[in-house]
Amino acid sequence: MVNNTFITKLPDFLEIQRSSFCWFLLKGLSYELNSLSPIIDVNVKRVKLKLYPQEFVLKPGRTTPICAKQNDSTYGVRIFLPAEVIYCDTESKYPTKKNRLEDIKEKVFIGQIPLMTSTGSFIVNGCEGYRNQIIRCPGLYYKAEFLNNNIVSTVTIIAQRGSWLKFEFDKNGYWVRIDKEKKISIFDFLEGLNINDEEILSGLKSIAPLLKYKKTQEILKRNNDPDLKNLIEKITDPNSYSLGIIGRLNLNRRLGLNISTRVHTLTIHDIFGIIDFFLSARSFVPDDIDDLRNRRIRAVGELITSQCEIGLNRLERNILERTNFSGSVRILPKTLVNARPIMSAIQEFFNSSQLSHYMDQTNLLSETANKRRISALGPGGLNADRVTVAARDIHPTQYGRLCPIETPEGQNVGLVSTLASYARINRNGFIQTPYFRVENGKILTQQPLIYLTAEQENLKIAPADVKRDQDGYLVDDFIVTRFQSKNFIITPSKLVDFISVSEIQIISVAASLIPFLEHDDANRALMGANMQRQAVPLLYPRKPIVGTGIESQVAFDSRLVNIATKPGIVKYVSSQQIDIKNIEGEKIAYKLIKYRPSNQDTCLNQRPLVWVGQSIKTGQVIADGPGTQSGELALGQNLTVAYMPWQGYNYEDAILVSDKLDIQNLFTSIHIEECETEVQQTKTGEQVITSDIPLVSEKNCKNLDENGIIKVGKYVYPGDILVGKITPKGEIDQLPEAKLLKAIFGFKTPDMRDSSLRVPGGLSGRVLDIKIFKKPKPGKVFGVGSKIRVFIAQISKLQVGDKIAGRHGNKGVISRILPHQDMPFLPDGTSVDIILNPLGVPSRMNVGQIFECLLGLAGDQLNKRFKILPFDEMYQNEASRILINQKLKDAAKKQNKPWLFSAYSPGKILLSDGRTGEKFDNPVLVGRSYILKLAHLVEDKIHARSTGPYSLITQQPVGGKSQNGGQRFGEMEVWALEAFGAAYTLQELLTIKSDDMQGRDDVLNSIVCGQEIPKSSIPESFKVLMRELNALGLDITTYKVMFENETNKNCLIKNEINLMQTYEEGIKAKIREEEKEREKEREAREMEDPEKIVSKIDAKQKKKYKKTKKQTEKKK
C-alpha cells in the first residue's frame, strides 16, 4: 500500500450548511427586504409609512445555544428595520419636502431568525434539526409518451414560483395548458398575450406546422372556452410568477437566448423560442427528470429566504389592512409594523415543515450524517405515496455527488440520500464533485482540483482505482472511462481527460468508515453504514485497530470535541475547564460539556486530553467528546471473535458473549432520562409543590427537600417520588365511601390528592441535575406555569436481548452471557470474547468482516493500527488477501506464535473448549473485530403486565409499553393453540384474559374467596361485532341452546336472547347492589337535615293513617 492515505484532503463535512447560511445573512435577507415597497399607504388619510430596507440591523439574542436548549427557547438574531411615519398635507402618492407636515422615524423590530450554531444546526424552541432538499430545477423540459396509439409531445416550463406552462401536441393540433386547467389553442394563447400576426410571422422560424391544424382547433374551441384573461395573468403577473435566476439561465441555455438574469418573467422572445423548440422537439431525446442536470439542492439558506419572502408579503398585507386607528391617535411606526407575520412564517418552517425534523444525536457520526442528508420530499418536491421506482433508483449522474449506498431502509428508500464525501454545492444549487486533470496519461496532482457539475461532464473520466506508477502515470494502455456521465467506454490512457481524486469519492462519510467495503454486498454495506449511526457512545470507547483514515476528520468536523482556537501553553486542567495562555499573554478558558442529555437520551460528555505545561497548536483537539478517543471516532470495542456454532446459542444471528465484557465495563453506557412536571391551574384549584403529601409515609418522602423536590445525587427506583405535588379535590373526585363516612361520623378526608412526579417504570438511576423554571406568586415559591425538570443518569450494562453489530451489516441479539472461563480459548490461553455464527457470512456475502477480523488479529499481536482505503485492487490483484497473509506471518514470527498462521488453513486456529479443556475437532476462524452496541436496548423494550387499562370500545387491554398495555395474542397465535388442541387455554385467553367484562370480575372474586373459577360469558368483542352488523342493516338473532333435562339429551331447546339488552344475572345483581348503595347514601344525606327528617316522619304517619283507614273501611 502507498504511504499517503489520501490523494487530497477531504473538505469540511459541515461547510455546506455554514456557507449556505452565510449567504442568507449577507445576500438573501437583504434581497428579500429590498423587495418590500419603500412607501406604503396606510388606511388613514394623508399618512404614509416609509421603510428603509437597506439600513436593516441584526442584533444578537440574549441567550446562548446551551441556555436555549435548557429553557426551550430559540437561539437567533433579531431584525430591526428603520421605519418612518410621514404626515402629509395633500393626498399625493409620494410625499415631498413641501407637502410633509411631520416625520416620526424609529427602528422597528420585525422578527427573529434562528442563528446557526458552531455545529451547523438550529435551536428552535429547544429542539434542533433540519434537512436540505433536492427538487426539480426550474426551466424547460421536453417529454414524449405513447398514449392511445398516438405520440403526445409536451414541453413544460417550470417556474420557481407560480404556475406551470405546458405546450402539448396531439392528433388535433398544438395546445397550451396552464396548471391543470383546460387546454387552449396556441393561437388563442398568443392572442391573449397581445401578440399580433406580424409579430408571429417575424418571431417564429416556421409557422406552417401550426397552420396545418388551425381549422380543427377552431372547431374544437366552441366546446372549450375557459376564462383566458385570468389564465394569462397567472404567467404574466410578476408578483405571482417568477422563473428565478436558475430558471432564466436554464431557459437561455436551452433556447439559445441572451436575456438578462434580472428578468424573471416570460418575454415575447421566450414564447417564440419555446414554440420553435416545441415544433422541432420530436427530433430531440426526451429529458430525464432524475438526471442531476435537472435537479438542484435547496440548502438551508434558500429555504429560510423563501420563508422570509412569505413573511414579508404577510407583513405588507398586514400594514395595508390595519384599520383600527381613530383620527385623534398619534400613529407611530411600531404601531403599524408587527413582528408576528415574519415570526409565524419562520416558525411554520422549523416546527411543521417536512424538511424540519428532530436531530439524530445518538453519536457524533449520526449528527454529521444527518446534516448532510438530502430529501426529495417536502414542498415543491416529490410525494412519497406516488413515486416511481426510477425516482428511487441510482442514476449515473449521482457518481461522486450522492452516495449510492447510504439511504433509509423503509418507505423513504432512494428519496432521502446523503452527499458523497467530496461533494459540494455551488451558488446555483447544483452538486459538484472534484477531479484531477490528466494530460497524455499523467495525473496532474499538483494542479488545483477542478469541480464539475453533471452538466459539465461531457469528457472522458477515469475512476480513482486505476493502476498508476510512482510518477503518476496511468499504467494500463486502455481504461474503462465514463463519457457524458452515462456511457462506459474503453479509452486509451493518453486520451483520458480527468480522473477521480479518491477511492471514497463516490460514497458518503458513514460508508467510507467501513474497511474492505468492496468485499461486501451493497445491501449489507447499507446496513453497516446505517448501524454505525445507531451506535451508543460507550463509557470507555476504543479506536478501531482497522480503520479507513477519516475517523479523525469525522470527530474534528462534528465540533463535539473541544478544539484550540489559538496556540499557547496549558495553565490549568480540570474535568470542567481547560485554561490556555496564548502567545499574547491572554488566558483563554475552554468550558467542557459535562453529562448533558442528547435528543436520543445518550450522554454528551467531554474529557480533557492535555496536561499542565503542554504546548498547544491551533486546531489541536484538547478534549475528547462522546464516542471519541484521542480525537478519533471511537464508537465500539475491539473484541476477539470466533466464527463457530456453540450449542445452538448463536442460531439465526443470535450472539454468544463472555461476561468479561460486563466485568471490564467494555459495553457500559450512560443514558440520561428527563422527567418533567408543571404547576397547573385545574378546575378545582391550583396545584402545589410540597413535601407534605397526603396518604404518603415519611419513608417515601425522605429523599425530598423542604420544597418537595428530590435531592441531587440520590439513587431512585421505579415509583419513587421525584417532585411532590398535590391537587385540590372536587366533590366529584370523592368516593361514595368517603362521602358516607363524612355524612355519618363527620370524618374529613384530605381535600388534596397526590399528583406527584414519580420515576417511570423500568427506569432507575442517580439524580444528575435539577432545572427549576420558577414563576413566583405572592406567598408561594412555585406559581402556576412553574416547571421542574429532573435528569436521571442510568448506567446500562450489556445484557441478554441487547443488539450488537459489526461495521459490515452483521447484526445480532445477545442470546447468552457465558462465564469467561467457559468460553473457547486460544493456544496462549486468551479466551474468546464473542462467538458468531459462520452461516451468517456466505449467504449475506459480506466477506469484508473476515478481512477485518484477521487483519485486526495481526494488528493486535503487532501492536499496530491499520488505515485501509476501500477498492485497493488499484495496487495489485487480490491486494487485501496478500496484505492480511503477510501481516499474519509477521505477527506469528514476531510474537513466536506459529499457530497464528497456517499455510494449510490461513486465518484458522485450533481452539480448546473452556468447559472441558479438550481441543475442538476442526480449526476455527478467530480474529479481532470492531463491535458496536446499538441503541436498541432490551431495557427500553421489555415489558410485562398483570392488570392495567382496557380499551373503551372493545374492552380489550390496550397495546404498547407506554400505555402499560398487554401482549397481543393475534390470529396466528390462535392457530398455533388450535393446532395443539389447547381448548381451555384458548378459551381463557380469548375471554377472561381479554374482553369478558363479567368474567374478569367473577374470576377476581373466586380467586379472593378461594372458590372454583366460573365459566366465562360472552366477550365484549362479539357484542361489538353484533352492533357493527346491525349498523349495516343486518337483523341477527342469537339463541341460547340447552338440553330439555339431564336424562333426555336428544331434545334441544332454543331460547332467543338479545345480547344488546339482556346481560348475565351477575351484572343485574351488580346493578341492583349499586342502586341500594345510592339509596343508603341518599338516606344518610337526608339524616343531616332536620326539616327533611320531619317531612319524612310526616309522610310515614300519613301513609300509616291511610293504611289504617282502609283496613277499618274493609271491616265495616
Curated annotation (Swiss-Prot):
Region named Disordered: 1070-1116
Compositionally biased intervals (Basic residues): 1101-1116
Bias (Basic and acidic residues): 1070-1100
Entry GO MF terms: DNA binding; DNA-directed RNA polymerase activity; ribonucleoside binding
SUPFAM superfamilies reported in the protein's UniProt record: beta and beta-prime subunits of DNA dependent RNA-polymerase (SSF64484)
Family the UniProt entry places it in: Belongs to the RNA polymerase beta chain family.
Cited function: DNA-dependent RNA polymerase catalyzes the transcription of DNA into RNA using the four ribonucleoside triphosphates as substrates.
Annotated localization: Plastid, Chloroplast
Quaternary state and interactors: In plastids the minimal PEP RNA polymerase catalytic core is composed of four subunits: alpha, beta, beta', and beta''. When a (nuclear-encoded) sigma factor is associated with the core the holoenzyme is formed, which can initiate transcription.
Record-given protein name: DNA-directed RNA polymerase subunit beta
UniProt GO cellular component terms: chloroplast; DNA-directed RNA polymerase complex; mitochondrion
Keyword Nucleotidyltransferase: yes
Catalytic activity annotation: RNA(n) + a ribonucleoside 5'-triphosphate = RNA(n+1) + diphosphate
